[in-house]
């Protein structure tokens, strides 16, 4: 449906559209910046190249692969059956957007990578408690969210630590690095593309069968990549220094893995910005309220554009934190982080475990750093990041609760 005069004449809907765009911008500045942080930190691409690539792919992911039906209340975190008044859903959505956006802007200002999903959940819980008390919150779901704070970075760190140790042993520290790099690099890169292909089916195309994704996309992508990389390395190893040669092999691949992360992020996390907009749009235009609502393409475009602009204008702060401040990254370390984070998220999706991509990426960065010893980690930065994770839900919730209360009193 096109943006008509009647729609634009509705001030509440117009405000919600602007807030949704602001939230999308904040997602781009914070969460989307994660997709390119390791590539920038390892020197695979420049920050300018990173924001262009991330911006284009985030928009493509949101517009072409974003879900056309979204939840009005993310993750079923509060009971929608207890919200019978459409005005509550409208003002609650506005309050949740404001709460989440303000917190994301604060976190981004200090270069802290936080979860946008947790931010919008915090906003929803905040207005939900103000409206219906503690009983309106689905505490079983909330416990799963809290568990994801703990599980995501730990699992990401352990997996990345083990992968990097294995990669170092097979490629970087062998007796004949050139021979080992030619033999093992295609294996590791092919394995990464098995995960990427399968994840593309699950996360971007929103498929339900992990086995189908593995057979249709993952396995063919992995085998093809293995063959291509093997042929290239057999003909020409890209350096006289074997260590630098191995790093250059993984540099090219790291750009591809980071680009995939950006595409998948746009497809998935755009819902955090446009879900509340779609809810208000449906109520305003059709007088309908429900647990799920259709999402017009123009709303997906709005979200994708906001994310792209957010990456381009303010994404450098979080990129710098994740890519440079936690630990020193090389191309093999950056590849390990992307591969580990994607694999952990894929396995978690298969098992139905709650997991945060942001927390997993940061955990993987820490794990790679720990593989070189505890002194390789900037402990002060890690401490600040962990504190920000635990503050995210309550901070967004308190802001949203105050905004919701003020709106309800104002509109009487």
Curated annotation (Swiss-Prot):
InterPro entries, from UniProt? Phos_transporter
Gene Ontology biological process: phosphate ion transmembrane transport
One GO cellular component, as annotated: plasma membrane
Quote the subcellular location field of this record.
Cell membrane
Topology within the bilayer: Multi-pass membrane protein
Q: Does the keyword Transmembrane apply?
A: yes
Which GO molecular function terms does the record list?
Answer: phosphate transmembrane transporter activity
- Asked if the Swiss-Prot or TrEMBL record annotates the protein with the keyword Transport, the reply is yes
Q: Which UniProt keywords apply?
A: Cell membrane, Membrane, Phosphate transport, Transmembrane, Transmembrane helix, Transport
Instruction: Give the transmembrane region(s).
Output: 7-27, 50-70, 88-108, 119-139, 143-163, 187-207, 213-233, 298-318, 335-355, 384-404
Protein's job:
Potential transporter for phosphate.
Q: Which family does it belong to?
A: Belongs to the inorganic phosphate transporter (PiT) (TC 2.A.20) family.
This one is known as Putative phosphate permease PF1020
User: Where does this protein come from, organism-wise?
Assistant: Pyrococcus furiosus (strain ATCC 43587 / DSM 3638 / JCM 8422 / Vc1)
